[in-house]
Amino acid sequence: MLFRSGTFSIALTHRYQFEGGTVADPTNWDGGQVEISTNNGASWDLIGGAVYDGAINGASGNPLQGEQAFVGTSTGYPATMVDTINLGTAYANQTVRLRFSVGTDSAAGAAGWELHSLALTGAGTPFATLAPQNTSCSPTAPLVFTDGFE
């Protein structure tokens, strides 16, 4: 994605239910994060800061242990909610990639993380030009069936 100058933000409509983070089990065993790359995915930086609920337990065996993440159960679950990550101008005029990661320990889990929609503000046009469709499907091509399926 190419971003023009100005502020860049990501609005996630999502819901999550990760193991832990409850009154009965206050330890955050699992969680989800949003990461960004400016070098085509060679390395990734954690973004999100204040939108996260807490840190993943540091002794859980989770690959994200000790890091901030969406943990526990989202507000109003199973309804979706919107969290906005404002990155300001830190990525202006750069091509970036976004990655959504879930880290878990090896024990029992919960429902997980569902991303319903994603809205980017401050993003440039993802494609400079649109290419016309030069071919079409052939409705008269022979059909091939295998394994007795006809």
Short names for language-model regions:
Residues M1-E150:
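Beta-sandwich/jellyroll recognition modules and their flexible linkers
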